[in-house]
Amino acid sequence: MTSTGPETSETPGATTQRHGFGIDVGGSGIKGGIVDLDTGQLIGDRIKLLTPQPATPLAVAKTIAEVVNGFGWRGPLGVTYPGVVTHGVVRTAANVDKSWIGTNARDTIGAELGGQQVTILNDADAAGLAETRYGAGKNSPGLVVLLTFGTGIGSAVIHNGTLIPNTEFGHLEVGGKEAEERAASSVKEKNDWTYPKWAKQVTRVLIAIENAIWPDLFIAGGGISRKADKWVPLLENRTPVVPAALQNTAGIVGAAMASVADTTH
């Protein structure tokens, strides 16, 4: 049975306004869980499986189905993807197989789940939704920008609670280089930079974004945000910067949020 809305953990398939289901697809792992949409907390444990190699659309879809079926979930679900997605169709592929490009991920994953309704969105966009509803950006009006610092730089823009998808600020040109070539945390590690030296590059990226859209708040995500005290105070841009609060659950939570929004509009 396919639900028309979010479910309860007690009765899979029942409709309520409390619970949703999210899947976070990463280069190394695919994880999912049931989310309490009132609190943004996971209900029970999540399930995490290794991302198949090669990470082709069908192989990933089958792994997603394993996670979903592990919970007995039969309602709509949200799935994050590490790249640009428009109208359910994948446009870029960085950490997954190139055969994703042009694939209707919504239909491919839905077919493996027997026709369950699937909402696909960029992974940073999912994290941005979660952080602005339940995390570091909660109760922050106006324009909020989430930046995830890792191998590259992911981005999400939320305006008064509404997602503006696929911003891809990591590819913004800053001083003749893409932003992520200048300030991804992987660049810091590769060059063995100190936090002060890396913070100068992050500042340049933040100022470039500020000059374009004048945000009210930056949220810094990615593993390096756990050490925000070592570098956020060194930033010299004008907009406040706060570390992400949800960390490893943000993708799952944001995906669950998106699935509910997709079924109620």
Curated annotation (Swiss-Prot):
Cleaved signal peptide residues: none
ATP-binding as UniProt keyword: yes
Function as written in the Swiss-Prot or TrEMBL entry: Catalyzes the phosphorylation of glucose using polyphosphate or ATP as the phosphoryl donor. Polyphosphate, rather than ATP, seems to be the major phosphate donor for the enzyme in M.tuberculosis.
GO molecular function, one term: ATP binding
Keywords: ATP-binding, Kinase, Nucleotide-binding, Transferase
Complex formation: Homodimer.
SUPFAM superfamilies linked to this entry: Actin-like ATPase domain (SSF53067)
Superkingdom of this protein's organism: Bacteria
Keyword hit for Transferase: yes
Annotated Polar residues bias: 1-18
EC number: 2.7.1.63, 2.7.1.2
Reaction catalysis annotation: [phosphate](n) + D-glucose = [phosphate](n-1) + D-glucose 6-phosphate + H(+); D-glucose + ATP = D-glucose 6-phosphate + ADP + H(+)
UniProt family annotation: Belongs to the ROK (NagC/XylR) family.
Residues bound to ATP: D24, V25, G26, G27, S28, G29
Additional detail: The poly(P)- and ATP-dependent glucokinase reactions both follow an ordered Bi-Bi mechanism, with glucose being the second substrate to bind and glucose 6-phosphate being released last. The mechanism of poly(P) utilization is not strictly processive and is most likely nonprocessive, where there is dissociation of poly(P) prior to complete utilization.
Identification of the protein by name: Polyphosphate glucokinase
Region (Disordered): 1-22
